[in-house]
Amino acid sequence: MGERNFHLHGNSFNRRAIGTEYETLACEYLTRHGYQILCRNFRCRQGEIDIIARDRDYLVFIEVKYRRDEHEGDPAEAVDARKQARILRTARYYMTRYHISEDTPCRCDVVAVLGSNVRLIRDAFWCG
């Protein structure tokens, strides 16, 4: 993935660049595991979803979280109840906007990147 030490973590531009870098890494990982990427960085008033994909019959809403090392904590823990609620509202909006049936099987996954390790957590939280 290359050197990352040029990033200054306090700068919002650099945080966005880091986020984009790890979302790209997540997309590559997901694609290798059979996911079809439909959309990246879907934004609306309700919030943002990092990646929207298909995994077999499922429409999957995916949050990507990164931490440099274990001293910063488990990246998956950053997807707290408030963040989950925002993702769910955004997912509902996405489905309404694109006329996706409520009967479509959906789930919410998290891609947790800790250093150079990528971990996929399928069905990380209830998707409704």
What are the residue ranges of the model-derived segments?
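Domain-level recognition of nuclease-like catalytic cores that cleave nucleotide substrates
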Residues: 97-128
